[in-house]
């Protein structure tokens, strides 16, 4: 039986980006210390944590030392190498579980898992050779989207294929890796549900948010999402079923396409999620606190939405809007303290209460 952590315990977090930063702040509010493990120097989370180890994920000595100095380990991104998890697991528990992580790390396993639960995904074909790509294209037709099975995020590692696409060139451009071809979903809009499950099996889901992506990167999330009552209930029940079937502990983000009024699951992330940032200003207990509560073995908090919110990301040079947003005064600003401005880099976000 997994232990219940008391305030004052230390939570280890793999990854020091903005999600690790906001997890650290939520943990600190509950009296926990955090220790960040991250390869790069001066990551956002290290400014708000009590411990920071700068090391690569294959530095097993540092990983062992890190894991033996904390009471539980969680993570802010899903592409953690298996070898690192093997080391950590010998020292302390990891939440969410390795099983959830393994499935979400591989788009093929993920789709098979979702279909097995009886839920819809885009149609798909495994692709592991140029001939395989030609065969998959004959099956699924165009438009379709070719994605790397692993290590993709924010639209990276994927390409949209049309009638004139050249399979040889495309296969080579994606690095001849293990791929998946997905039928193009002609959706009207995209939504996501942020759900959480505690160690004793309590489940709580935040209201679905409606997401707008540009170039594969999330731009805005609006709550409430444009859904019928039935669709909203279905999205929440699907999320709960995924949590239940994985015996999951922590927060999950499940992304859906809404196409012809049908909910089609795109993917899930076994962690706090960018499309859940609205909860920071729209709920008594936000996704970050909910995650810390769950992995600490505490009861989940009240995630009921008390207002309508729009969350907007500040991407790349949109961070230059900061002075205007400060002058505006009516939005809640969340800045990550990143120094280098790069195209596509998430620099901050803000939440605006609509009503
Ligand atoms: P992903 O990295 O798989 O979440 O994809 C990023 C974004 O690309 C999604 O949020 C969608 O806007 C779009 N997208 C991904 N897969 C598909 C698909 N099969 N059909 C249509 N659009 C897609």
PLM feature segments, named:
Residues 1-109, 131:
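ATP-binding N-terminal substructure of ATP-dependent carboxylate-amine bond-forming enzymes
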Residues 280-281:
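A conserved FAD-binding loop/helix module that cradles the flavin
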Residues 103-192, 196-242, 355:
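Active-site nucleotide/adenylate-binding loops and adjacent lid/helix of ATP-dependent enzymes
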Residues 341-354:
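An anion-binding loop in the catalytic cleft
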Residues 313, 318-321:
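Extracellular/lumenal mucin-like low-complexity stalks
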Residues 173-227, 232-265, 269-277, 289-302, ...:
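Phosphate-binding core of ATP-grasp and ATP-grasp-like enzymes
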Residues 305-314:
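Short glycine-/aliphatic-rich beta-strand segments at the starts of folded cytosolic domains
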Residues 32, 50, 92-93, 119-122, ...:
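A structural micro-motif
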């Amino acid at each position: 039986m997994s232990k219940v952590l008391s305030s004052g315990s230390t939570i280890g977090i793999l990854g020091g980006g903005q999600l690790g930063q906001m997890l650290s702040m939520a943990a600190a509010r509950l009296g926990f210390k955090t220790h960040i493990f991250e390869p790069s120097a001066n990551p956002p989370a290290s400014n708000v944590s009590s411990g920071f180890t700068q090391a690569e994920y294959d530095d097993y000595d540092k990983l062992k030392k890190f894991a033996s100095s904390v009471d539980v380990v969680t993570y802010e991104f899903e592409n953690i190498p298996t070898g690192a998890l093997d080391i950590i697991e010998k020292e302390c528990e990891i939440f969410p579980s390795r099983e959830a992580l393994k499935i979400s790390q591989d788009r093929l396993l993920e789709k098979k898992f979702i279909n097995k639960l009886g839920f819809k995904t885009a149609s798909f074909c495994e692709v592991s050779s140029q001939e395989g790509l030609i065969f998959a294209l004959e099956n699924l037709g165009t438009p379709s989207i070719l994605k790397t099975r692993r290590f993709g995020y924010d639209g990276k590692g994927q390409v949209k294929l049309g009638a004139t696409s050249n399979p040889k060139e495309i296969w080579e451009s994606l690095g001849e890796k293990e791929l998946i071809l997905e039928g193009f979903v002609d959706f009207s809009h995209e939504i996501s549900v942020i759900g959480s499950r505690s160690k004793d099996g309590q489940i709580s889901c935040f209201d679905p948010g409606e997401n707008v992506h540009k170039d594969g990167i999330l731009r805005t999330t609006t709550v409430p999402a444009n859904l019928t009552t039935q669709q909203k209930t279905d999205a929440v029940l699907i999320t709960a079923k995924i949590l239940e079937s994985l015996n999951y502990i922590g927060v999950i983000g499940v992304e859906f396409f809404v196409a012809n009024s049908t909910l089609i699951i795109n993917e899930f992330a076994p962690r706090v999620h960018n499309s859940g940032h609205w909860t920071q200003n729209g709920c008594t207990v936000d996704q970050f606190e909910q995650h810390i509560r769950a992995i600490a073995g505490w009861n989940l908090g009240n995630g009921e939405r008390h207002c309508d919110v729009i969350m907007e990301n500040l991407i790349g040079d949109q961070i230059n809007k900061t002075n205007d947003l400060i002058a505006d005064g009516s939005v809640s600003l969340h800045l990550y303290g990143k120094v280098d401005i790069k195209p596509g880099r998430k620099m901050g976000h803000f939440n605006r209460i609509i009503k």
